[in-house]
């Protein structure tokens, strides 16, 4: 890929500004954890694995900002840093997974000097980024055999390199199939209201030379019924113990349409996206975002002033609509409750 989603550089965090794509490829530099939190909240960086990496790097930046003489004082302030980052996006479990991992690193080194702890936290954040890239490639390797020669794959939102440290989850599967020499095409839903499919997925695939056709969200059923789509692959922000999956709003509709038209619907996500503490998708918290995201498009009003708006950012697809969950450890099918537990060794 010819872009970097996020990286640690000279004790600063550098992110591609996804709100400026596809018009401008701009990289922002962040020197403090508060600005990283705002970048996550403002969707300058988005996608569950990517915001996990961003949160980890935010913790590492925050640790460098803390003024303390004792570990107890450092720990109290680090908890505040973590709390600020944790409040940015409530649905994506990778955010909380990364923050908890950083907390454990600090606690396990509490007997060391604070300089060592700060450097160890920086190293851990970089390690999380590097691991995510390897995980995405493994997801691609496991998922590519599910994409047959000549397939046309529908994807929703953006689960590509921009949503991860690189390569992608759903787009990682597509990339791996393409790299294996398969002649495939992609249909990308535009994904209202943020247009991640139009702005980001189409941009990524075109940069990689993978054939992509952009469609409006309400066209998916039409093309499925016509036989133009042969598989669906999406990412995930949180997966419950029974396989119910939270992903970008509109995913549930795509899954239902796929089932009706006998098209396999796959979820591609790292094991860190699993939340086995939740019995079902009914327990997944759903972020509700500002009304202006629906009433305005690129700053221009597209709805009457004062209209009532609902804007959930995610929906939950019941496991019965999912043909398989593709992870870095393999593909899970069927009895998700049993197989997901086995996957993580529970």
UniProtKB/Swiss-Prot annotation:
One of its GO terms (biological process) is L-methionine salvage from methylthioadenosine. One of its GO terms (molecular function) is S-methyl-5-thioribose-1-phosphate isomerase activity. Substrate binds at residues 46-48, 89, 196, 247-248. Pathway: Amino-acid biosynthesis; L-methionine biosynthesis via salvage pathway; L-methionine from S-methyl-5-thio-alpha-D-ribose 1-phosphate: step 1/6. Keywords: Amino-acid biosynthesis, Isomerase, Methionine biosynthesis. It is an enzyme of class 5 (isomerase). InterPro entries: IF-2B-related, IF-M1Pi, IF_2B-like_C, Initiation_fac_2B_a/b/d, M1Pi_N, NagB/RpiA_transferase-like. The record marks 157 as: Transition state stabilizer. It catalyses: 5-(methylsulfanyl)-alpha-D-ribose 1-phosphate = 5-(methylsulfanyl)-D-ribulose 1-phosphate. The active site is at residue 237. Its EC number is 5.3.1.23. Belongs to the eIF-2B alpha/beta/delta subunits family. MtnA subfamily. Catalyzes the interconversion of methylthioribose-1-phosphate (MTR-1-P) into methylthioribulose-1-phosphate (MTRu-1-P). This is Methylthioribose-1-phosphate isomerase. It comes from Geotalea daltonii (strain DSM 22248 / JCM 15807 / FRC-32) (Geobacter daltonii). The lineage of its organism: Bacteria, Pseudomonadati, Thermodesulfobacteriota, Desulfuromonadia, Geobacterales. The gene is mtnA.
């Amino acid at each position: 890929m010819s872009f970097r989603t996020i990286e640690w550089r000279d004790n600063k965090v550098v992110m591609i500004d996804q709100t400026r794509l596809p018009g401008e490829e701009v990289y922002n530099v962040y020197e403090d954890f508060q600005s990283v939190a705002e970048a996550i909240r403002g969707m300058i960086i988005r996608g569950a694995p990517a915001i996990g990496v961003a949160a980890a790097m935010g913790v590492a930046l925050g640790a460098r900002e803390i003024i303390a003489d004792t570990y107890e004082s450092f720990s109290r302030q680090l908890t505040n840093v973590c709390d600020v980052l944790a409040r940015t996006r409530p649905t994506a479990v990778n955010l909380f997974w990364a923050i908890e991992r950083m907390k454990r690193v600090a606690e396990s080194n509490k007997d060391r000097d604070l300089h060592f702890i700060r450097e160890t936290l920086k190293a851990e954040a970089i390690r999380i980024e590097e691991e995510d890239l390897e995980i995405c490639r493994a997801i691609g390797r496991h998922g590519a055999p599910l994409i047959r020669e000549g397939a046309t794959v529908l994807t929703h939102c953006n689960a590509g390199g921009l949503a991860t440290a690189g390569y992608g989850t759903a787009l990682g599967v597509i990339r791996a199939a393409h790299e294996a020499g398969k002649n495939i095409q992609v249909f990308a839903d535009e994904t209202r209201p943020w247009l991640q499919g139009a702005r980001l997925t189409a941009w990524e695939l075109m940069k990689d030379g993978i054939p992509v056709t952009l469609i409006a969200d309400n066209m998916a059923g039409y093309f499925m019924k016509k036989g133009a789509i042969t598989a669906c692959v999406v990412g995930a922000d949180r997966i419950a113990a029974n396989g119910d999956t939270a992903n970008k709003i509109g995913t549930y509709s795509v899954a239902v349409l796929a089932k009706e038209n006998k098209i396999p619907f796959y979820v591609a996500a790292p094991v860190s996206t699993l939340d086995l503490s939740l019995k079902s998708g009914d327990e997944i918290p759903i972020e509700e975002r500002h009304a202006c995201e629906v009433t305005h498009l690129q700053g221009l009003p597209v709805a009457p002033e004062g209209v009532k708006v609902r804007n959930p950012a995610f929906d939950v697809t019941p496991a019965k609509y999912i043909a398989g969950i593709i992870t870095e450890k393999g593909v899970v099918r069927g009895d998700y409750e049993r197989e997901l537990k086995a996957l993580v060794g529970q």
